[in-house]
Curated annotation (Swiss-Prot):
GO cellular component terms given for this protein: chloroplast; DNA-directed RNA polymerase complex; mitochondrion
Localization: Plastid, Chloroplast
Keywords: Chloroplast, DNA-directed RNA polymerase, Nucleotidyltransferase, Plastid, Transcription, Transferase
Protein name: DNA-directed RNA polymerase subunit alpha
Organism: Bromus inermis
Length: 339
């Protein structure tokens, strides 16, 4: 456990982690402070962060299980202590850590008698189990037991109809919530006109993310949410009173991408795969899920098409432009490639 003394500041807005501990493999705790804040700001930040932490953080979970020759979820299987419903509930509690996108397959295939734990799940390389000792079932007889699983990344709590499908699979109410709980408290400091507030934020996670990682992701999601309001230029808004104030240039992705499309003559865009563009794994996975495999596929998409891709964010959009700007004028034109 790490502890630090809280040092109040009346100058620059700062945050720090004042306490961090691991209570168990599936319970991490972190305590953070943000100060100095003007009166009312701590409540604004605290409410926004709490909602973002509980509802906007993505998590990986088991979403479906397929048993062989099981008529319904309340059935019992000979040689297994638990019913199918109990096994599904145990699978629901398995905590996974991964950056995967889309649906992945996993499985369990063991021979009894023995206890089945999370360690027995055969996972794709990109997924790992936080607590391998989590129980799944107890085989009391020498039987072969196999389950096919589906793993997906999502956010929030997804409830599905409790029915078995024709292929014998059962949906699991997916809990894609790495953050278990969030509390915040506000303390006032100073006297008179120098009075300010300190925000204390407590975060508990399930071990798939640390509280610090969760806080970072929630903050990024909030920033992405408010970015459209910064595009005053696109709305034709002018602020005369701010003309002498430095403002970072707005990201005009659509205009730049249009210019690239106009100048793509002589470049074999269908022969250039996005694997060659040095994209981040997050951006690359988003494009792959949308069946964008080549530079021609990418330049054929509008800005609106890209923003409709699941989990695609504005920072991904900027990263794509920076990468295209880096590669197209230098690498491709220099080599004089043509269709």
């Amino acid at each position: 456990m790490v502890r630090e003394e809280v040092a109040g500041s009346t100058q620059t807005l700062q945050w720090k982690c004042v306490e961090s501990r691991v209570d168990s493999k599936r319970l991490y705790y972190g305590r953070f402070i943000l100060s100095p804040l003007r009166k009312g700001q701590a409540d604004t930040v605290g409410i926004a962060l709490r909602r973002a932490l509980l509802g906007e953080i993505e998590g990986t979970c088991i979403a479906r299980a397929k048993f062989g020759s099981v008529p319904h979820e309340y059935s019992t299987i000979a040689g297994i202590e638990e019913s199918v419903q109990e096994i599904l509930l145990n699978l629901k509690e398995i905590v996974l850590r991964s950056n995967l996108y889309g649906v992945r397959d996993a499985s369990i295939c063991v021979k009894g008698p023995r206890y089945i734990t999370a360690q027995d799940i055969i996972l794709p390389p990109s997924v790992e189990i936080v607590d391998t000792a989590q129980p799944i079932a107890n085989l009391t007889e020498p039987i072969d037991f196999c389950i096919d699983l589906q793993i997906k990344r999502d956010r929030g709590y997804q409830t599905e109809l409790r029915k078995n499908y024709q292929d014998g699979s059962y949906p699991i109410d997916a809990v894609s919530m790495p953050v278990r709980n969030v509390n915040y408290s506000i303390f006032s400091c100073g006297n008179g006109n120098e009075k300010h507030e300190i925000l204390f934020l407590e975060i508990w996670t399930n071990g798939s993310l640390t509280p610090k990682e969760a806080l970072y992701e929630a903050s990024r999601n909030l920033i992405d949410l408010f970015l459209p309001f910064l595009h005053a230029e696109e709305e034709g808004t002018s602020f005369e009173e701010n003309k002498n104030r430095f403002t970072p240039p707005l990201f005009t992705f659509k205009k730049r991408l249009t210019n690239l499309k106009k100048n793509k003559k002589g470049i074999p865009l269908n022969c250039i795969f996005i694997d060659q563009l040095e994209l981040t794994s997050r951006t690359y996975n988003c494009l792959k899920r949308a069946n964008i495999h080549t530079l021609l596929d990418l330049l054929s998409k509008t800005e609106e098409d890209l923003m409709r891709i699941d989990s695609f964010r504005m920072e991904d959009r900027k990263h794509i432009w920076d990468t295209l700007e880096k590669h197209l004028p230098i690498d491709l034109l220099k080599n004089k490639l043509s269709f």
